[in-house]
Amino acid sequence: MHWSNNNPNAWGDPGSWLAYGPMWAQVSMTPFSQYKAWLAEGGIRNALIVSGPVVKRPTGSINRGAMHVSDIMPTLLEVAGTSYPANYKGKEVPPALGKSWLPMLEGRVESPRTDTDVLAWELFGNRALRQGNWKLRWEAKPFGKADWELFDVAADPGERRVRDGDQPVDAVLP
């Protein structure tokens, strides 16, 4: 049997592995449900600190706008004053995903997303869609029901109350 070397002096060395396990992972994401590797808010909601000359928001301000990792490249391109190429070495490049955060960083909008934008995730067979405050999530058992569940993440960021009976899914997500 091989045990990883978790001595603090060896952190980051080959053979070291640091993790505090699922129960502490859940504690670290309180009040959200679940943690990394899941599509509940605890797995996809993150803190991000941004600083620099393009940030015009008040110091210490908190923004709760919906953002996605796919937004990073469009943001960096816009800050750099350049654009995403349509082709490279004579080959067409697929369109970039994501939206620039620059209008949000400059304090002109609260989110790069509108209420009609849809974000989608798939990870390890689990999947989720979000539009505005509504989130439709399917997660495998034992953490999920292996069925679609609808949540209002603005009113219930911990995803404790399934809203399937309150709002028809086709009225929420087109």
Per-region residue spans from a language model:
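Metal-dependent active-site segment of extracytoplasmic phospho-/sulfohydrolases and closely related
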Residues: M1-W11, G43, I49
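Conserved residues at the C-terminal ends of beta-strands
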Residues: G52
